[in-house]
Curated annotation (Swiss-Prot):
Function: Catalyzes the condensation of carbamoyl phosphate and aspartate to form carbamoyl aspartate and inorganic phosphate, the committed step in the de novo pyrimidine nucleotide biosynthesis pathway.
Gene Ontology terms: biological process: 'de novo' pyrimidine nucleobase biosynthetic process; 'de novo' UMP biosynthetic process; amino acid metabolic process
HAMAP family in the record: Asp_carb_tr (MF_00001)
Catalytic activities: carbamoyl phosphate + L-aspartate = N-carbamoyl-L-aspartate + phosphate + H(+)
Enzyme Commission number(s) of this protein: 2.1.3.2
InterPro entries assigned: Asp/Orn_carbamoyltranf_P-bd, Asp/Orn_carbamoylTrfase, Asp/Orn_carbamoylTrfase_sf, Asp_carbamoyltransf, Asp_carbamoyltransf_Asp/Orn-bd
Family recorded in the similarity comment: Belongs to the aspartate/ornithine carbamoyltransferase superfamily. ATCase family.
Binding site for carbamoyl phosphate: 53-54, 103, 131, 134, 263-264
Gene that encodes it: pyrB
Keyword Repeat: no
Transmembrane segments: none
MF GO annotations: amino acid binding; aspartate carbamoyltransferase activity
Name of the featured protein: Aspartate carbamoyltransferase catalytic subunit
Length: 300
């Protein structure tokens, strides 16, 4: 993959995706081979929203490549609290680091940041927009379990505000898959994403219940309801807990169904699913390290 920045899954071709996944598999098999490869590099971590997995896996990935990270820390302890603009912040951080990983509550912020710096900018989530590096590790996990073609994939939950969903849906258009979107009507895919999928010729179906499609699925990607994105708390309460997967429900699924979740989960996957062979979400999270190592290896 040869891009100056990674801002959206829409910029990734099939070749880009497979290249990163192949490199990640090589690194996972022999991490010592790259243990000092980027010992002269520093990665800037600018997270304007909370993060556990994404931030820690980028930190781990950079250090396992021999480099180090510079963390802006809490927004409350930075000059952002004093009113500093995003443009000024990234122009300063550019002078300290060789690449910037940015998470921000406003859609389009990584693209804006990329216009002010010459180092690579990697989108680690921009509001309800995109999360392309999550998609790469999702694709890696799907490929490990089921391949990437001739699949029926269900994506369930908050499709309106879920940025991981938007990125994954775009990336899957590069492959021979049928996508089924399961959500309340109020949380269906945004019109812009639907338009992109239609223009790509993707096989897409929308549902309001999981039971009608579960037995056909090879992969079920579950997401939480994005409470922090709702403009009205009452709107959130109307849909919270409406879609839930448990072991009893999965009795009607294929034996080899892969159940995924970008995490954190709230109540949308019951704890009893953890003990089934379907559960893949913790391994999915762990895959973030080799995938982000591969991405950094190609972009630095």
């Amino acid at each position: 993959m040869r891009h100056d920045h990674l801002l959206s899954a829409k910029q990734l071709s099939r070749g880009d995706i497979e290249g990163v996944l192949d490199r990640a598999a090589e690194i996972a098999a022999d991490p010592d081979a790259v243990a000092e490869k980027h010992s002269d590099k520093l990665l800037g971590l600018l997270f304007f929203e909370p993060s556990t997995r994404t931030k820690m896996s980028f930190d781990t990935a950079m250090k396992r490549l021999g480099g180090d990270t510079v963390d802006m820390g809490s927004v409350d302890s930075s000059s952002v609290k004093k009113g500093e603009s995003l443009a000024d912040t990234v122009r300063v951080i550019e002078g300290y680091t060789d690449a910037i990983v940015l998470r921000h509550p406003s859609e389009g912020s990584p693209k804006l940041a990329s216009e002010f710096v010459d180092v690579p900018v990697i989108n680690a989530g921009d509001g309800a927009g995109q999360h392309p590096t999550q998609t790469l590790l999702d694709m890696y996990t799907i490929r490990e379990n089921a391949g990437l073609d001739d699949l029926t994939i269900g994506i369930m939950g908050d499709l309106k505000y879920g940025r991981t969903v938007h990125s994954l849906a775009h990336a899957l258009t590069n492959f021979d898959v049928s996508q089924h979107f399961i959500s309340p009507e109020s949380l269906q895919l945004p019109r812009s994403v639907r338009y992109d999928l239609h223009e790509s010729g993707a096989q897409v179906r929308e549902h309001t219940d999981i039971e009608s499609v579960l037995e056909t699925l090879d992969v079920l990607y579950v997401t939480r309801i994005q409470r922090e994105r709702f403009p009205d708390e009452n709107e959130y309460r109307q849909v919270a807990g409406e879609y839930r997967i448990d072991a009893d429900l999965l009795e009607s699924a294929k034996d080899d169904l892969t159940v995924m979740h970008p995490l954190p989960r709230v109540s949308e996957i019951a704890a009893d699913v953890d003990e089934t062979e379907h559960a893949t979400y913790f391994k999915q999270a762990h895959n973030g390290v080799p995938v982000r190592m591969a991405l950094l290896d190609e972009m630095l």
